[in-house]
């Protein structure tokens, strides 16, 4: 059989690449050294869809985090898999740590993260009642989410 493109690896990147190539009438084959799709690093990742506040401004990671965070709900809907926009909190336990939160906030703003803000103790405990009582503030990133990496990779492979 003849192919236009050979994709090496059936993890999340390989399967996403093959899925995208399918939009262009290209005949793509995916080869995998493991016994099945998503048996390597992809299945063991944290499942976090990052908002983009921690990446260096101007970096590809910053761009891909922000764009991916916006694109993931629609992709998951199309693939009929769950996506949860749960947000993320970066906790601050004392005032000496607050400049770190402010630096992350500035990075996120530069990267184009929507809705990013610092929340104080009262609102933090409303957002997450089980948070440590010692937390005094947090950076809140409402555009962060989670998706099962195994389900995502398998759905893209299909």
Residue locations for each model-derived region?
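Aromatic/hydrophobic pocket-lining residues that form π-stacking "cages" and hydrophobic walls in ligand
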Residues: 17, 72, 104, 155-156
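Proline-glycine-enriched beta-turn/loop adjacent to the NAD(P) cofactor-binding site
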Residues: 11, 34, 47
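Helical element adjacent to the flavin cofactor pocket in flavoenzyme catalytic cores
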Residues: 139-158
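Glycine-rich FAD pyrophosphate-binding loop
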Residues: 22-44
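Short beta-to-alpha linker loops that shape the active-site pocket of alpha/beta-hydrolase fold enzymes
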Residues: 34-36, 124, 156
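N-terminal Rossmann-like FAD-binding beta1-loop-alpha1 element of flavoenzymes
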Residues: 3-30
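Dinucleotide-binding Rossmann-like beta1-alpha1 core, especially the glycine-rich loop
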Residues: 47-127, 136
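The feature captures the short pre-catalytic strand/loop hairpin that immediately precedes
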Residues: 132-133
């Amino acid at each position: 059989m003849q192919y236009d493109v050979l994709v090496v690896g059936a993890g999340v990147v390989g399967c996403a690449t093959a899925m995208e190539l399918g939009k262009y009438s290209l005949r793509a084959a995916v080869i995998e050294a493991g016994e099945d799709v998503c048996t390597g690093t992809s299945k063991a990742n944290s499942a976090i869809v990052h908002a983009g506040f921690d990446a260096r401004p101007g970096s590809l990671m910053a761009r891909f985090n922000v764009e991916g965070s916006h694109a993931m709900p629609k992709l998951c809907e199309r693939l009929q898999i769950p996506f949860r926009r749960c947000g993320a909190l970066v906790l601050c336990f004392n005032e000496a740590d607050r400049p770190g939160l402010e630096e992350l906030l500035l990075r996120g703003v530069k990267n184009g993260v929507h809705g990013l803000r610092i929340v104080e103790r009262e609102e933090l405990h409303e957002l997450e009642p089980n948070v440590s009582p010692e937390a005094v503030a947090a950076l809140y990133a409402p555009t962060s989410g989670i998706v099962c990496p195994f389900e995502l990779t398998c759905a893209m492979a299909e």
